[in-house]
């Protein structure tokens, strides 16, 4: 294929499909992480293209914290059914028994137990040797220096000082028993690329990405959308209906909305063209401490 004759989106598409096929051919038990967000939707679309007209040769895995938006759960189940995907859902049973709650225990402990430990449990349970993730290098500085094939030791830990060279699109997937590789096919995409590709390919997304009038309250400098009744209002707090949308999706108490009137994909793309902030500014878990994402990845987080 002559890369010079492709548009930049088609070049990114071709690179991602190549990576996905490489992993399917090289590893014995791969899995695709499915977090239900826009990046997961693009990655799933690319995987379906990679093996069309066949079915995916690996399952989808959702590590459930119990605190995702209701619209996300509905979208997850509807998508898996529509595409005939095998969907594995894992929730940390110890965390459930402990009643881990982001309001009570804080974002750090909630993320560590329900996400990081939950993910490691699922990978160990099913014996996956490679796991696709939708992370991109433009999102956050620790992700910017991570390889497409990200080596993890038998404890699922990432060592940024022990990364493998990736020259001329050659990826080293050699691992010993118990070790694994996290694979990021969207590493070279930007947030704008993602939205332009979603528009180009007419990819279905969670409606929360589009602006609508939603019940929110302001807490700690973040617009929190109230998705159910598991919240205690603090003195002086008031729930108001505002036109908001989400640039990134996660657990609803830990994911901030942004004021917006962008109700269509072209309007979102217009916003992205003038945006000067990262989409992850709305993630509470990224504010825990300096270098918090790198620390989480060292501990086994995606």
UniProtKB/Swiss-Prot annotation:
Q: Which Gene3D superfamilies match?
A: HUPs
Which CDD domains does this chain map to?
Sulfate_adenylyltransferase_2
Keywords (alphabetical) are: ATP-binding, Nucleotide-binding, Nucleotidyltransferase, Transferase
Domain of life, per UniProt, equals Bacteria
| Pathway(s) | Sulfur metabolism; hydrogen sulfide biosynthesis; sulfite from sulfate: step 1/3
Question: EC annotation?
Answer: 2.7.7.4
Complexes and interactors: Heterodimer composed of CysD, the smaller subunit, and CysN.
Name the chain's protein: Sulfate adenylyltransferase subunit 2
Instruction: Identify the species of origin.
Output: Enterobacter sp. (strain 638)
